[in-house]
Regions:
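Catalytic active-site module of serine/aspartate enzymes centered on a nucleophile-bearing elbow/loop
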Residues: 136-180
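Conserved alpha/beta-hydrolase "acid-adjacent" motif
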Residues: 128-137
Length: 180
């Protein structure tokens, strides 16, 4: 079990996933899980540029014990998420993402043999969650199966979240790919 899931399951309000029966929500665990996950969505460069080692001003602190801006930001994001997302759904969704492996049963190259469509693989240099090397593996498997594929790595300083901020960069690539 990963740290993210464990933080939810260890919350006193989780009740083995039956928290709705007790009219509670495992907010602390869900908040911690999201804070941990959120770190992997951002890049080191983005976090350094946005927060550095700056101290949080006392007027806008989320709660006591917070010293740095990054802590305050993660607390805010965790609180926001715990108010709007179901803990069991988060566990299932992240477990599905963690366990997905296109080449698990037969290898990536063989798993691509039945693909008839052309492929566009887009990545960002700063993405820790799906680093550019994974996209290259996908394109190599496609090429070994004579699949028409394009692989593009874009600059973006927001890590995995770069696709949310640099839509102009990849929307042109997607449009060109679809119309070709």
């Amino acid at each position: 079990m990963c740290i993210r899931d464990r933080s939810i399951r260890k919350d006193k309000n989780f009740y083995d996933g039956n928290y709705h029966d007790h009219d509670v929500i495992p907010k602390n665990g869900l908040k911690t899980a999201r804070m941990l996950g959120h770190i992997t969505y951002l890049s080191e460069e983005h976090m350094d540029n946005r927060f550095g080692r700056r101290f949080q001003d006392s007027e806008s602190k989320m709660n006591k014990g917070i010293d740095f801006e990054i802590e305050n930001y993660l607390q805010y994001k965790g609180n926001q998420f715990s108010e709007s997302f179901d803990a069991n759904s988060y566990i299932l969704m992240t477990k599905a993402m963690d366990n997905y492996d296109a080449g698990k049963s037969m290898g990536l190259i063989d798993s691509f043999k039945s693909i008839k469509a052309k492929l566009l693989i887009v990545g960002f240099y700063s993405d820790w969650l799906y680093p550019p090397e994974r996209g290259k593996e996908i394109q190599l498997a496609a090429m070994q199966n004579n699949i028409n594929s394009s692989y593009v790595i874009l600059a973006g300083d927001h890590g995995h979240d770069s696709f949310l901020f640099h839509t102009d960069k990849y929307s042109k690539i997607i449009r060109k790919f679809i119309t070709s």
